[in-house]
A protein has these predicted regions:
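Conserved, mostly hydrophobic/aromatic
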Residues: 14, 22, 44, 78, ...
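A short, acidic, flexible beta-alpha connecting loop/helix-capping segment that sits on the rim
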Residues: 113, 147-150, 182-186
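Mid-domain alpha/beta scaffold segments of enzyme catalytic cores
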Residues: 1-47, 53, 90, 124, ...
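Active-site gating loops and adjacent loop-to-helix segments of metal-dependent hydrolytic enzymes
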Residues: 17-19, 82, 103-106, 157-166
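Short, small-residue-enriched loops and turns at beta-alpha junctions
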Residues: 4-5, 28-32, 82-85, 114-117, ...
Length: 194
């Protein structure tokens, strides 16, 4: 956990340990705030880090101007929390696509359960959003499990079902390989796979 008081030496130390981003959890009151995004983005950009945003749709809409100004890559958690039942018709979806089009934004295909109104096993509403992301920008997607699902206290989702959703969202093996292997290599600076 970092805030704007973190030293450059500490950021460099963390970089040496493999840290590649700062997560702003704006879904809950906590250690990170929207006001920290720009100054921290500037400081970690030269390290090649990204800023990761976990926030409800209304909060992302509030900070969209900040996100348009930051220099570092952006990663949106949980399909960018596109609200259901509006899905791709919600204004946030257009905001996210516009940021993707700028070439520095990624979306994490994770948390299909986070904003669904339909639920398991198909999560058909969230799945529809994920499929459009795959169609429009497969080169800007990474997958995540969100295990151990800290936001879900009582009814933890089935991780096998969540992983299998990727077969529906990205039916072509080469696209899944891109999402699971090539894109994380690019985003996190992993060594290229053979």
């Amino acid at each position: 956990m970092v805030d704007t008081t973190v030293s450059d030496a500490e950021l460099k130390r963390m970089n040496g340990l493999g840290v590649r981003g700062i997560r702003f959890n704006l879904a809950q009151a906590g250690a990170t705030t929207p006001e920290m995004i720009e100054p921290l983005s500037k400081r970690v950009n030269d390290l090649g880090w990204h800023i990761q945003i976990n926030a409800p749709a209304a909060k992302i809409m509030e900070i969209k101007d900040i996100l348009n100004r930051v220099s570092s890559p952006i990663v949106f958690d949980h399909l960018a929390h596109i609200p259901e039942p509006e899905g791709t018709a919600h204004p946030l979806f257009g905001v996210v696509l516009a940021l993707i089009d700028k070439g520095k934004t990624w979306v994490k295909l994770s948390g299909a359960y986070a904003d669904t109104k339909v639920g398991p096993p198909s999560y058909s509403d969230s799945s529809a959003v994920a499929r459009v992301y795959v169609q429009k920008a497969p080169e800007r997607l990474v997958w995540g499990s969100d295990w151990p699902h800290p936001s879900e206290r009582d009814n933890k989702p089935d991780d096998a079902i969540l992983f299998d959703l990727l077969l529906d969202w990205a039916p072509e093996e080469r696209v899944r390989n891109r999402i699971l292997v090539q894109n994380p290599e690019a985003l996190y600076g992993f060594a290229k796979s053979a």
